[in-house]
């Protein structure tokens, strides 16, 4: 069995007059995130982790913000595309661990819905998907409620024939 680990990180700033979408879930908050796509910072970090595990670059390479085709793009579609690239190379998700770093809004009420969506989009068992959230104790840009940061780690496996 071949095993690959990928790490993804992304940050987006609050300020867009649109819904806050995280893992495909609309999270009630006063503002959304500024981005070329729908701004789903969690799915961007996960997509980067998958691409990184397979040495396929990053989401900026695959979905450049200079391409109008991705203006307002649904990040779930982008994530499924990244996972399809992994599947085409014979890899499947072993597990996913995500940390959402935000002072606000509170994520706890939305974590299970996020896990359900990720399990469906990554054709994985719910037990293979972990999403957690933390604050920075009011320190830094996330502590000042200026934006959200996310770290994602994936383990990808391929069985040899």
From Swiss-Prot:
<feature type="binding site">
    <location>
        <begin position="36"/>
        <end position="37"/>
    </location>
    <ligand>
        <name>4-CDP-2-C-methyl-D-erythritol 2-phosphate</name>
    </ligand>
</feature>
<dbReference type="InterPro" id="IPR003526">
    <property type="entry name" value="MECDP_synthase"/>
</dbReference>
<feature type="binding site">
    <location>
        <begin position="134"/>
        <end position="137"/>
    </location>
    <ligand>
        <name>4-CDP-2-C-methyl-D-erythritol 2-phosphate</name>
    </ligand>
</feature>
<feature type="site" description="Transition state stabilizer">
    <location>
        <position position="135"/>
    </location>
</feature>
<feature type="binding site">
    <location>
        <position position="44"/>
    </location>
    <ligand>
        <name>a divalent metal cation</name>
    </ligand>
</feature>
<feature type="binding site">
    <location>
        <position position="144"/>
    </location>
    <ligand>
        <name>4-CDP-2-C-methyl-D-erythritol 2-phosphate</name>
    </ligand>
</feature>
<feature type="binding site">
    <location>
        <begin position="63"/>
        <end position="67"/>
    </location>
    <ligand>
        <name>4-CDP-2-C-methyl-D-erythritol 2-phosphate</name>
    </ligand>
</feature>
<comment type="pathway">
    <text>Isoprenoid biosynthesis; isopentenyl diphosphate biosynthesis via DXP pathway; isopentenyl diphosphate from 1-deoxy-D-xylulose 5-phosphate: step 4/6.</text>
</comment>
<feature type="binding site">
    <location>
        <position position="12"/>
    </location>
    <ligand>
        <name>a divalent metal cation</name>
    </ligand>
</feature>
<keyword id="KW-0414">Isoprene biosynthesis</keyword>
<keyword id="KW-0456">Lyase</keyword>
<comment type="similarity">
    <text>Belongs to the IspF family.</text>
</comment>
<dbReference type="Pfam" id="PF02542">
    <property type="entry name" value="YgbB"/>
</dbReference>
<feature type="site" description="Transition state stabilizer">
    <location>
        <position position="36"/>
    </location>
</feature>
<feature type="binding site">
    <location>
        <begin position="102"/>
        <end position="108"/>
    </location>
    <ligand>
        <name>4-CDP-2-C-methyl-D-erythritol 2-phosphate</name>
    </ligand>
</feature>
<dbReference type="InterPro" id="IPR036571">
    <property type="entry name" value="MECDP_synthase_sf"/>
</dbReference>
<comment type="subunit">
    <text>Homotrimer.</text>
</comment>
<keyword id="KW-0479">Metal-binding</keyword>
<dbReference type="GO" id="GO:0016114">
    <property type="term" value="P:terpenoid biosynthetic process"/>
</dbReference>
<dbReference type="GO" id="GO:0046872">
    <property type="term" value="F:metal ion binding"/>
</dbReference>
<dbReference type="InterPro" id="IPR020555">
    <property type="entry name" value="MECDP_synthase_CS"/>
</dbReference>
<feature type="binding site">
    <location>
        <begin position="10"/>
        <end position="12"/>
    </location>
    <ligand>
        <name>4-CDP-2-C-methyl-D-erythritol 2-phosphate</name>
    </ligand>
</feature>
<comment type="function">
    <text>Involved in the biosynthesis of isopentenyl diphosphate (IPP) and dimethylallyl diphosphate (DMAPP), two major building blocks of isoprenoid compounds. Catalyzes the conversion of 4-diphosphocytidyl-2-C-methyl-D-erythritol 2-phosphate (CDP-ME2P) to 2-C-methyl-D-erythritol 2,4-cyclodiphosphate (ME-CPP) with a corresponding release of cytidine 5-monophosphate (CMP).</text>
</comment>
<feature type="binding site">
    <location>
        <begin position="58"/>
        <end position="60"/>
    </location>
    <ligand>
        <name>4-CDP-2-C-methyl-D-erythritol 2-phosphate</name>
    </ligand>
</feature>
<dbReference type="GO" id="GO:0008685">
    <property type="term" value="F:2-C-methyl-D-erythritol 2,4-cyclodiphosphate synthase activity"/>
</dbReference>
<feature type="binding site">
    <location>
        <position position="141"/>
    </location>
    <ligand>
        <name>4-CDP-2-C-methyl-D-erythritol 2-phosphate</name>
    </ligand>
</feature>
<dbReference type="GO" id="GO:0019288">
    <property type="term" value="P:isopentenyl diphosphate biosynthetic process, methylerythritol 4-phosphate pathway"/>
</dbReference>
<feature type="binding site">
    <location>
        <position position="10"/>
    </location>
    <ligand>
        <name>a divalent metal cation</name>
    </ligand>
</feature>
<protein>
    <recommendedName>
        <fullName>2-C-methyl-D-erythritol 2,4-cyclodiphosphate synthase</fullName>
        <ecNumber>4.6.1.12</ecNumber>
    </recommendedName>
</protein>
């Amino acid at each position: 069995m071949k095993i690959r680990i990928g790490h993804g990180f992304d940050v987006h700033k609050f300020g867009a007059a649109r819904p806050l979408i995280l893992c495909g879930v609309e999270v009630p908050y006063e503002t959304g995130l500024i981005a070329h796509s729908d701004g789903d910072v969690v799915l961007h970090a996960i997509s980067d982790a998958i691409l990184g595990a397979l040495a396929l670059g990053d989401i900026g390479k695959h979905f450049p913000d200079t391409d109008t085709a991705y203006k307002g793009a649904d990040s779930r579609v982008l994530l499924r595309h990244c996972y399809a690239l992994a599947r085409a190379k014979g890899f499947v998700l072993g597990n996913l661990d995500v940390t959402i770093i935000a002072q606000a809004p509170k994520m706890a009420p939305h974590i299970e819905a996020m896990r359900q969506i990720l399990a469906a989009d990554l054709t994985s068992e719910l037990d293979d998907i972990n999403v957690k959230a933390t604050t920075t104790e009011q320190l830094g840009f996330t502590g000042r409620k200026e934006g959200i940061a996310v770290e994602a780690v994936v383990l990808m496996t391929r069985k040899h024939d």
